[in-house]
From Swiss-Prot:
It catalyses: NAD(+) + (deoxyribonucleotide)n-3'-hydroxyl + 5'-phospho-(deoxyribonucleotide)m = (deoxyribonucleotide)n+m + AMP + beta-nicotinamide D-nucleotide. SMART domains: BRCT, HhH1, LIGANc. NAD(+) binds at residues 36-40, 85-86, 117, 140, 177, 294, 318. The gene is ligA. This is DNA ligase. Belongs to the NAD-dependent DNA ligase family. LigA subfamily. Transmembrane segments: none annotated. Zn(2+) binds at residues 412, 415, 430, 436. Residues 597-675 form the BRCT domain. It is an enzyme of class 6 (ligase).
Length: 675
């Protein structure tokens, strides 16, 4: 017998302690601290060491048992047959070796038939039916003894309280998985967050926490569901002789079984099924972490038997982990095309979801604070399919004493403009909309759009080319373009280039309302832009207005007033506006309506325009109404003064008639405005 190195003994002892700790958190507290992949890695390391040094194997090793002892808060429920876990396969070679072990043990020359199904990420339970009636529901617990959760199980509508059909045994144990599907999980978390309550990290935690509530009324409010995956103890009757046929029978008796189940032949069939489900994994309505292969014929299962903690006739083939632990090195802030700031975690590179991840989104500062993410933390990173990797949770037990809080910058990391965050909003934004390089593409596209400066021929793709070629940095750069520069772009001939230069020249003569809208100020749509233009009469007066003055404008509240004032306070934005004026952009200014707003004839009235007018556009009609002190709304309500209906008026007219709101014809509208 070879001497066992002391460091091996210490490592084995350390692994057992760590696995026992995580067993307790996972099986007993239902509050796992590390992802399944990290636990699996620890277990495999211990298995490998015990295989190499069998003298170190002890009866209490985590490799020799299923889990930990159940909590005492529920009554104990002893299983009539042990509920064992499954061994795992991570690579194709593991599946081939699994099949070879089976064939060697059975002495089979022909290929083995396997029942295959997705491995749901939920909570395993046992349902006991006596004379067709549900009499007990129990968690797996340590495999021999679980917890009696009958009252909670009865609240899950996917679980029948009475079996259907006929032919079921007098005593039948159904085994399956309680889980929360993705839609239910997301809806539950949204509602919990809106109430300021705790949200769950993932559907598995949500299912486990919900099923183990001491008050079944709480469980009843949670969107739990169930899939049966097999039968356990049976008395007073017989079941079919294959696993697949048993699932079919359970379905006939009213149990919910997974529609993705199948029967395949040999390891090749198993691997093809693994690939097929893997391709559809992200589109399934529930989370899975692998697929399960079971020898289909029970007679062969009985011949194969069990090892200490798992059956020889089944294995779980895991997909690349969608969650992993790693170190959060730093947090940086990215500026999106609309100016939104997103905190991004810079990570110690980790392999997760099939790729190496070194960056992950933290979404916004509300999420950072809710999860209490700090620089230096060990975090759980999640990546599913093509979804951007995210920091799902913090492993608080591994937080170092020098972990640093994440601090939101006060100025844009791209352009230096002030960062603003409106009350009640999760997202902070850069206020340098016209100047910020991160926002330039969207700013130029909006500026050129039909309802803004209406630059004919300047579409989104051409804007992309102009920015990529370095010809335009900010919107004022559009008016410095030459036909020669434009002709050199892809799909831009000499004629098209001259046409665009002419369109740019034509757009210089505009309306103040259009120009204000073209600036892309947050929350300022066409109607608000018109209201601002009418109220102040000129751009200089608008730029000089403080928030209090802005709130005197019809339909402008504190949020919009703050956005407008902040926009014009930024030196970079003012520089771009000055450059546009120097380039020749101009409009006709008027006397500010603010001087006599309360005395205007339509002050206090609200109108809605619908259909096509013959005498003017709806936009022009709205300007006339606002010039007379009225508000123009896009929707009809009981507070609407009247609806002005042109030709082909639509649903707004119908709603006005339903609410009893007066309807004016075009002739009545012209009379109203004095024309």
């Amino acid at each position: 017998m070879s001497e066992i190195p002391e460091k091996v003994r210490k490592r084995v002892a350390s692994l057992r302690d760590e696995l026992d700790y995580h067993n307790h958190r996972y099986y007993v507290l239902d509050d796992p601290e590390i992802p399944d992949a990290a636990y699996d890695a620890l277990m495999r390391e211990l298995q490998d060491l015990e295989a190499k040094y069998p003298e170190l194997v002890t009866p209490d090793s985590p490799t020799q048992r299923v889990g930990g002892a159940p909590l005492k808060a529920f009554e104990e429920a002893r299983h009539l047959l042990p509920m064992l876990s499954l061994d795992n396969a991570f690579e194709e070679a593991d599946v081939l070796a699994f099949e070879k072990r089976i064939r060697d043990r059975l002495g089979e020359e022909s290929e083995i038939e396997f029942a295959v199904e997705p491995k749901l990420d939920g909570l395993a339970i046992s349902l006991l039916y006596e004379d067709g009636h549900l009499v007990r529901g129990a968690t797996r617990g340590d495999g021999a003894t679980g917890e009696d959760v009958t009252a909670n199980v009865r609240t899950i509508r996917a679980i029948p309280l009475r079996l259907q059909g006929r032919g079921w045994p007098k005593l039948l144990e159904v085994r399956g998985e309680v889980y929360m599907d993705r839609a239910g999980f997301e809806a539950f978390n949204r509602e919990a967050a809106s109430r300021g309550e705790k949200v769950f990290v993932n559907p598995r935690n949500a299912a486990a926490g919900s099923l183990r509530q001491l008050d079944s009324r709480i469980t009843a409010k949670r969107p739990l569901t169930f899939f049966a995956y097999g039968a356990g103890h049976v008395e007073g009757g017989e079941l079919p002789d294959t696993h697949a046929a048993v699932l079919d029978a359970l379905a006939e008796w009213g149990q919910r079984v997974c529609p993705e189940r199948d029967v395949v032949t040999g390891a090749a069939g198993c691997l093809e099924y693994y690939r097929r489900i893997g391709e559809r994994r992200d589109g399934l309505p529930y989370d899975i972490d692998g697929v399960v292969y079971k020898v289909n014929r029970f007679e062969l299962q009985q011949r194969l038997g069990f090892v200490s903690r798992a059956p020889r006739w089944a294995i779980a083939h895991k997909y690349p982990a969608q969650e992993q632990m790693t170190l959060l090195r730093d947090v940086e802030f990215q500026v999106g095309r609309t100016g939104a700031l997103t905190p991004v975690a810079r990570l110690e590179p980790v392999f997760v979801g099939g790729v190496t991840v070194s960056n992950a989104t933290l979404h916004n500062m509300d999420e950072v604070e809710r999860k209490d993410v700090r620089i230096g933390d060990t975090v759980i990173v999640r990546r599913a399919g093509d979804v951007i990797p995210e920091v799902a949770a913090v492993v608080l037990s591994r937080r170092p004493h020098n972990a640093r809080h994440v601090v939101m910058p006060t100025h844009c990391p791209v352009c230096g403009s002030e960062i603003v965050r409106s009350e009640g909003e999760a997202v902070a934004r850069c206020s340098g909309g016209l100047y910020c390089a991160a926002q330039r593409r969207e700013a130029i596209k909006h500026f050129a759009s039909r309802r803004a400066m209406d630059i004919e021929g300047l579409g989104d793709k051409l804007v992309e080319q102009l920015v990529d070629a370095g010809l335009v940095d900010h919107v004022d750069g559009l008016y410095r373009l030459t036909a020669e520069q434009l002709a050199g772009l892809e799909r831009m001939g000499e004629k098209s280039a001259h046409n665009l230069v002419d369109a740019l020249e034509k757009s210089k003569h505009t309306q103040l309302a259009r120009f204000i809208f073209a600036l892309g100020i947050r929350e300022v749509g066409e109607a608000t832009a018109r209201a601002l233009a009418i109220h102040f009469g000129g751009l200089d007066a608008l730029m000089a207005a403080d928030e209090e003055a802005l709130m005197q404008v019809p339909d402008v509240g504190p949020v919009v007033a703050h956005h407008v004032a902040t926009f014009f306070q930024q030196p970079h934005n003012r520089e771009v506006i000055d450059a546009l004026r120097e380039a020749g952009v101009h409009w006709e200014e008027s006397e500010p309506a603010a001087l006599q707003a309360e005395d205007l004839p339509l002050s206090g009235n609200t109108y809605v325009l619908t259909g096509a007018l013959e005498s003017m556009t709806r936009e022009e009609a709205g300007d006339r109404l606002m010039a007379l002190g009225a508000k123009v709304s896009g929707s009809v309500s009981k507070k609407t003064t009247a609806v002005i209906a042109g030709e082909a008026a639509g649903s707004k007219l119908a709603k006005a008639e339903k609410l009893g709101v007066p309807v004016l014809s075009e002739a009545e509208f012209l009379e109203l405005i004095g024309e």
